[in-house]
């Protein structure tokens, strides 16, 4: 069972890191693209670009609302011509309205990633992953996390005593000869 855990845990951590990397990579690329367009211009031009982004997102919201009202209006009328026009209206709205993610609060959630994305747009973001280490028997402090990392754990199992003078059974004869 121990060998299974030793193989499974690093594979799970690696898979988790890969998934996190691709998620943040896509988010950073979209955010960096928007930032690159705005940062290319200075002063009032950048402010105008930000306003244009806001107007585009507002117009997308309005089109989505029009689609919803159109769908509700024609929901109860089911004859052939109206259903065809409804399908055309829905397809038109679906083509024109493409939801885009909003990254306005993204810097609050992951400020380190924002700095890396701004500095390293060519090579992509640098993912900084951290997780709690296992509690050590010397510190006598329990972590509040139910699952902890294997980093920092001793190679000797915790049930076996350490080499000490108080417990002579734990010492091998060769070590006893070296200590004298």
Curated annotation (Swiss-Prot):
Disruption of the gene: reported phenotype? Increased growth of the perineurial glial layer of the larval peripheral nerve.
- Keywords, comma-separated and alphabetical: Cleavage on pair of basic residues, Developmental protein, Differentiation, Neurogenesis, Neuropeptide, Neurotransmitter transport, Secreted, Signal, Transport
- Where's it mainly located? secreted
Tissues in which the protein is found? Enriched expression in the embryonic and larval nervous systems. Strongly expressed in two large neurons that project over all the lobes of the mushroom bodies.
Q: Which Gene Ontology BP terms does the record give?
A: anesthesia-resistant memory; behavioral response to ethanol; behavioral response to pain; cAMP-mediated signaling; courtship behavior; learning or memory; long-term memory; male courtship behavior
Q: Name one GO cellular component term.
A: extracellular space
- For region Disordered, the annotated ranges are 155-180
Q: Name one GO molecular function term.
A: neuropeptide hormone activity
Q: Where is the signal peptide?
A: 1-32
Q: Where in the cell is it found?
A: Secreted
In this entry the propeptide is located at: 33-35, 152-180
Record carries keyword Endoplasmic reticulum: no
Report the function annotation for this chain.
Required for associative learning and memory in adults. Expression pattern suggests a modulatory role in memory formation. Controls neurotransmitter-mediated signaling pathways associated with the structure of the larval peripheral nerve.
Could you tell me what this protein is called?
Amnesiac neuropeptides
